[in-house]
Amino acid sequence: DDEYHLENARAIGISECSLLSNMGKESIGREYIANSHWRIVENIDVVCIVSANSYKNVNNNKLLENIKNDFLNCFSENEEALFVSDYVEREFSKQVTKGHSYEYKVSAMLADLLLNTYKFEAVAYPSVKLGGQAGLNLAIRPDIADSKLKLINIADQCYYKNSENGIVEIESIYDVVNDKV
């Protein structure tokens, strides 16, 4: 992987978590956001939610493309696996209307099953808000985050939004390793 997808990490965080972003195109305001950078200190056993039909229009996500190709190399002849993976991927990638969080119940139950029953350490799935275009979300078990990740720095940022235009300004970066701003 050429790691091109990493350039979009802040965009994914804002699109998935920002209240301003989720208020719609016409929202205006300012919001403070903290973004953290972690180093993997030990390999993490990740299951990726993908199917043969995942985000067909995505054209700039090399990681997602590689994962789909690996999946198809293993399961392209297995109709049952294709059917189940398509259902699971649809549950993880559907747009949920504000106030209808109950629509996350199936994907939440599946993630819990994968993490706690099958003992995967993390679940990766394409960003819904960006249509899979910019990268993947990663849900990591807390014990794995504590033992296999090391916090490197924390960036305090301000997200300014004026209708359809937005910009993120980094206000400070705290270097955890060297204990300095």
Predicted feature residues:
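A short, exposed loop/beta-hairpin motif centered on an aromatic-Gly-Thr core
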Residues: 1-7
